[in-house]
Amino acid sequence: MGSLKNTWLRRIFRWHSWLGLLTGVPLLLLGLSGSVLVFKPELDHWLAPRVAPPPAGRAPVPLDSLYRMVGHRYPAIKKMAIVGFPQRPGECYEFRIYGNDGNPHTYDLAGVWVDPYAGRVVQEGANTGLAGGALNWLLQFHFCFQLGMGGVLLTALLGLALLASVATGAVVYRKQLGKVLLLRAPLRTHSWRLLASDLHRYVGTWALLLNALICFTGFWMNLFGFDPAAWRAQCQPAPPNQLMARPVDALLATARAAYPELVPTRIRLPTHPGTPFEIDGVVPGHALPWGPGAAVQVDPTTGRVLTVRRAWQAAWPAQWEALMAPLHFGTFGGWPVRVLYVVVGLTPGLLALTGFALWYRRRAGAARA
């Protein structure tokens, strides 16, 4: 029995080693980009283009006019949304464009910044380049490595691989987990091999549960990469726009009257019939842990309120989906939690480096023997 157990432990150790070697570089890139994206809202605001403040007494351009201007500028897209709102003079609306050129190996998102008083485009560009916003480029890289649906599938598989690496690592170091967590395992610094081994064990143990949570939620959000229907949809170019007849400002007023406590974080603007006008946002007192788990939908043809959504009152499948993004990016617990996510996001890179050092040392020792 002992021999069989040792055989299985050696096999699990080899799996752990090869998982780390094969996925180390992409997981390093995902960890680094994810650590930056934890503070994407603040960085977006800091990096966003600015315009001259408007003259005193000048009224902003109606949102409906901006919607139609952007819709004619991008005449064949799946949808658009407003994801950034001016809070002070000189700030712009940020529109997000959801295009589809029929190529499943590209992801056709773009950013458009619009002066709310002059009604002109200040900056625009696809998320495959920096003109679409440096953080938008980084988010798309984190999401799919800028490789379209193939990248979505790859990042989902990497999430599974990291989960397997966490599980096999927990088995390999199972007898030392308690000592490491209680700080009873010394950090040996008298040789680089021992230091690498101890760092690998310490970092992997302390980040184990949060790394498992992050990689599982990332896998779950990219699960559609396994769906053939999603691939087929990406092969269908977006048809020409059919913009809403009813003014955006009227729909916005209806939505706000139906859900006055909702603080908008995104306004989804249909470009084709059959898609509702929707405001997503947060409700004070219910922001944690749901993130933007509240929404109101309005029929753009009739102006009738369709749904008012509160994730904390929904059935568990809807609650589950609403939790995924906040748990993945650490947006559910304020600054201390977000800083913790930044630190843990750096650990896959450190684990990859220390793991490679240990593998290389063993390989070199075997060659000398």
Please state what every model-predicted region is.
Residues 1-369:
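Conserved histidines in hydrophobic membrane contexts and catalytic metal-binding motifs
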